[in-house]
């Protein structure tokens, strides 16, 4: 896939999302096997590029199992929109005042605040691994993305740690508000 390498090299720091012709898997088209697409997906991931499916009908119709593969094997973790730093480089202010309150049902309500009061302008990402400090670069730690509410119900689970970041409409993410909370403290 030399075209993808060239696109990545010539991107000038901008997002390039190659469109994968999944319609070619249709028997009415070229009847490609699923492995042709999965090979392209892994290659694009290896060189740090995203992708788009063309046409979405073949994705939602699960042609040759592409939807199952994408949800069960390839895209098992949430992902964030890459930041458009060429449009706006500054990150939003990080959230503050992270608190945990035990609910009657035993769950915890995690709440935070942010200087921007309009909840539609600054969505939040919540991370929760078992290690501290929370690694916000690891998508496996994401438990909620682009959340507009400033609270989240979480299980009362020992050994979990939490961090919250703010994002702007350009995908820029703030520094993390980290809390070394565990359910038994």
Where are these regions (language model features)?
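Pro/Thr/Ser/Gly-rich low-complexity, intrinsically disordered linker/stalk tracts
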Residues: 68-120, 170-185
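Solvent-exposed loop/turn segments flanking beta-strands in beta-repeat/beta-sandwich domains
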Residues: 115-138
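Beta-strand-rich modules
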Residues: 152-174
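Flexible, glycine-rich phosphate/dinucleotide-binding loops
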Residues: 25, 60, 133-135, 173
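Short beta-strand segments within Ig-like beta-sandwich modules, predominantly Fibronectin type-III
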Residues: 141-148
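Residue-level recognition of well-ordered beta-strand positions that form the cores
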Residues: 111-113, 127, 165
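Substrate-binding cleft of secreted/luminal carbohydrate-active enzymes
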Residues: 1-86
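Active-site lining segments that contact anionic ligands and/or coordinate catalytic metals
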Residues: 13-15, 48, 107, 121, ...
């Amino acid at each position: 896939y030399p075209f993808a390498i060239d696109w990545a090299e010539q991107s000038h720091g901008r997002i390039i999302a190659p469109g994968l012709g999944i319609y070619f898997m249709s028997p009415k088209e070229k009847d490609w096997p699923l492995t042709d697409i999965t090979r392209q997906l892994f290659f694009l991931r290896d060189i740090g590029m995203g992708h788009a499916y063309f046409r979405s009908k073949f994705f939602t119709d699960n042609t040759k199992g592409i939807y199952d593969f994408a949800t069960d094997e390839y895209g098992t973790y949430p992902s964030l929109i890459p930041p458009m730093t060429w449009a706006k480089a500054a990150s939003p202010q990080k959230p503050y005042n992270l608190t945990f309150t035990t609910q009657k049902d035993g769950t915890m309500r995690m709440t935070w605040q942010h200087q921007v009061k309009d909840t539609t302008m600054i969505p939040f990402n919540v991370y929760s691994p078992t290690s501290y400090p929370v690694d916000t670069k690891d998508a496996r730690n994401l438990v909620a993305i682009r959340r507009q509410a400033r609270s989240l119900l979480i299980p009362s689970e020992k050994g979990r740690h939490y961090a919250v970041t703010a994002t702007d409409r350009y995908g820029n993410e703030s520094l993390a508000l980290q809390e070394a909370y565990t359910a038994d403290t």
